Amino acid sequence: MALLRGVWGVLNALGKSGADLCAGCGSRLRYPFSFAYVPKWFSSSLSGYPKKPMTSYVRFSKEQLPIFKAQNPDAKNSELIKKIAKLWRELPDSEKKIYEDAYRADWQVYKEEINRIQEQLTPSQMVSLEKEIMQKRLKKKALIKKRELTMLGKPKRPRSAYNIFIAERFQEARDGTSQVKLKAINENWKNLSNSQKQVYIQLAKDDKIRYYNEMKSWEEQMMEVGREDLIRRSIKYPAKNDPEKF
C-alpha cells in the first residue's frame, strides 16, 4: 500500500500536460505533453497514460484564442493573453460555472482512469515506471518550461555583438557547409577594426534596452494573468556605458 501511495504521488506530480502548466495564464502548449515517461509494455497494454484535464480558465482561453487571433492577426500571443484574461475577469459567474463544471467532470473521469491503470500494474511494473519517471522528469520539465515560455511570448534574450555579426554574415554566405561558413565568419570578425566592431557593439547595447523594455511589459502581463511564478526576483537594468563582451 505504501508503494502504491508513493507511485501515485509521483504520477500525480509528474503526469502534467502543457495545458495544466499554463493554468491561469490564458494559453496552452500547442501539443500536449506529459512529464511521465511511459514504457512500451505500459503503453501497449494500457493504451497510454491519461493527461490531466484543462482547468476552467485554460478551457476558456483555448476557445477564445483562435477568435482573438482572427480579429488581431498581427498581435503577439502575450497581447492576446492579456485581452483574454481581461475578458475572463469580466465574465459573469453564471458563465464561468459552465467551464468550472466541465473541469470537475473531466477531473472525475481522469481520477477513475488513473485508478484503472494502477489496478492493472504489478508491483514490479510500478517500481520500473517510477524509476523511468524520475530519470526523465528534469529533462521533460525543462523542455516543457521552455516551450511554455515561448508560447507565452517571453522576449528573446539580447544578443552579443559577435552573435549579431554572425547572424548577419551567415545569411549572406552561400558556399560551403555551416561549419565552413562559421569558420570563415569568425576569421572575418577577428580581422575587423575596433571602429567596425563598434557598430555591432552599439547594436548589442540597443538590443539589451529592447530586451529590458519587452521583459518589463511581459512581466506586467504575467502579473495580470496570475503567473507571478514567471517574474524575475531581481531585475538588472541596462547600464548606459556597459562594456560589451565579445
Swiss-Prot record:
Residues 50-118, 155-219 bind DNA. GO terms for molecular function: chromatin binding; DNA binding, bending; mitochondrial promoter sequence-specific DNA binding; mitochondrial transcription factor activity; transcription cis-regulatory region binding. Its main location: mitochondrion. The record marks V58, L182 as: Intercalates between bases and promotes DNA bending. Pfam families: HMG_box (PF00505), HMG_box_2 (PF09011). One of its GO terms (biological process) is positive regulation of DNA-templated transcription. The modification Phosphoserine is found at S56, S61, S160, S193, S195. Binds DNA via its HMG boxes. When bound to the mitochondrial light strand promoter, bends DNA into a U-turn shape, each HMG box bending the DNA by 90 degrees. This is Transcription factor A, mitochondrial. It comes from Bos taurus (Bovine).
